[in-house]
A protein has these predicted regions:
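Phosphate/pyrophosphate-binding loop motifs in nucleotide- or prenyl diphosphate-using proteins
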Residues: 1-192
Length: 192
């Protein structure tokens, strides 16, 4: 097993730099640290979703995904290290196909919302897209594994589908986008 922290604070980052997994020091605002932070925020957002009542299969999948995101973070934290594989990407694709099979085809865009769990899945999806963009930016400057980028792309798709699944499981439905909808006079204003 890797390095264990016996002390939470080290004071080594007080000057604005931090240590990567290979021991090199970089600025805390470097692209690599930024991408790592985005993946960490994604994992935390999925943890928030896991605090909700979820179907057992969704819970098991998300719990596994949290571990895989830690692996992905390890890959980002150690330049040149690869921990993500095409097998993990394929597994997400299989989950996507399985969950999407039972959903009605979409005729319109849907809004992020519905049940609390579905809304959190959509929030996780948007955080995942941000993490993916950060990883793509990093890959333009330094080598990044293609499986890691693909994984985040598929994960955001899965989180979208899970938002729909969770709305259905919670007795709700997709919130359909209504083109051109505006606030009507006398509705949606301040309550008196």
């Amino acid at each position: 097993m890797g390095h264990r922290l016996t002390k939470i604070y080290t004071r080594t980052g007080d000057t604005g730099d931090t240590g990567l997994g290979d021991g090199t020091r970089v600025s805390k605002d470097s692209q690599r640290v930024h991408a790592l932070g985005e993946v960490d925020e994604l994992n935390s957002t999925i943890g928030l979703l896991l605090a909700e009542e979820l179907p057992a299969g969704v819970r098991a999948a998300l719990a596994c995904i949290q571990h895989e995101l830690f692996d992905l973070g390890g890959e980002v934290c150690i330049p040149g290290h690869t921990s993500m594989s095409e097998r993990q990407v394929s597994r997400l694709e299989a989950l996507l196909d399985d969950y999407n099979r039972d959903l009605a085809p979409l005729k319109e865009f849907i809004l992020p919302g519905g049940t609390r769990a579905a809304s959190l899945a959509h929030l996780a999806r948007t955080v995942c897209r941000r993490a993916e963009r950060a990883l793509v930016s990093l890959s333009r400057a330094e080598p990044v594994g293609t499986a890691a980028r693909k994984y985040l792309n598929r994960l955001s798709d899965l989180l979208f589908v899970l938002g729909r699944v969770l709305n259905r499981a919670g007795g709700g439905s997709d919130v359909l986008w209504q083109r051109g909808k505006t606030i009507e006079k006398g509705k949606g204003g301040r309550e008196k």
